[in-house]
Amino acid sequence: MADYLKLFQDSLKGLDTKFAGNQILSRIEAQTKLPRSYVIVGLVAVYFLLIFINVGGIGEILSNFVGFCIPTYYSLKALKTATSTDDTQLLTYWIVFSFLSVIEFWSKAILYWVPFYWFFKTVFLLYIAIPSFGGAQLVYTRLISPFSDKYLPIVEGKSGELAQKVEAAANNAKASGYSR
């Protein structure tokens, strides 16, 4: 039990140091005399509580907001990296997010069968969106890849052949003296 308490306290200290320069949290900390980490944890708890109780349907917009903003941030960061390791994770996320958005067309039926759907959706989306959890990789290897390999075969040759033909035509045009 002490290990979990130590881990939680270390996480709170990490939040305090990570958000040390945030002016809004500094102002709240000065007014309430609470550490920044308590304010952050409290705001996150209220956010999840609003999603959980879904008063006036606010759970849907809050769930979709967090499901869009956090992965968008990671996607913008991934566009600036040279490696493709984060691309698979983010593409998997956006496939799942799109699938859930299409399924939610029948949201009244979903809410009838799954009363806390928006809360579960938010937790699941955070699980697959945050790279350190590795949820997107698990969803990709267990669900998406087997399904797509079986039902959506990708034909590699057609696009490659077309690219080769275009390149050959461009080279022929250059060789014959064509210039812009």
UniProtKB/Swiss-Prot annotation:
GO CC list: endoplasmic reticulum membrane; Golgi membrane
Main location: endoplasmic reticulum
Entry keyword set: Endoplasmic reticulum, Golgi apparatus, Membrane, Transmembrane, Transmembrane helix
Topology of this chain in the membrane: Multi-pass membrane protein
Pfam family, one: TB2_DP1_HVA22
Stretches in topological domain Cytoplasmic: 1-35, 79-88, 128-180
Segments traversing the membrane: 36-55, 58-78, 89-105, 109-127
Membrane side Lumenal: residue ranges: 56-57, 106-108
UniProt subcellular location: Endoplasmic reticulum membrane; Golgi apparatus membrane
Endoplasmic reticulum is among the record's keywords: yes
Stated role: Required to generate and maintain the structure of the tubular endoplasmic reticulum network and the vacuole. Induces high curvature in membranes and causes membrane tubule formation. Involved in membrane/vesicle trafficking.
Family: Belongs to the DP1 family.
PANTHER family with a match to the protein in the record: HVA22-LIKE PROTEINS, RECEPTOR EXPRESSION-ENHANCING PROTEIN
Subunit organization: Oligomer.
Domain commentary: The short lumenal loops between transmembrane domains 1 and 2 and between transmembrane domains 3 and 4 may impart a wedge-like configuration, thus deforming membranes.
Descriptive protein name: Protein YOP1
Organism: Kluyveromyces lactis (strain ATCC 8585 / CBS 2359 / DSM 70799 / NBRC 1267 / NRRL Y-1140 / WM37)
Lineage: Eukaryota, Fungi, Dikarya, Ascomycota, Saccharomycotina
Gene that this sequence comes from: YOP1
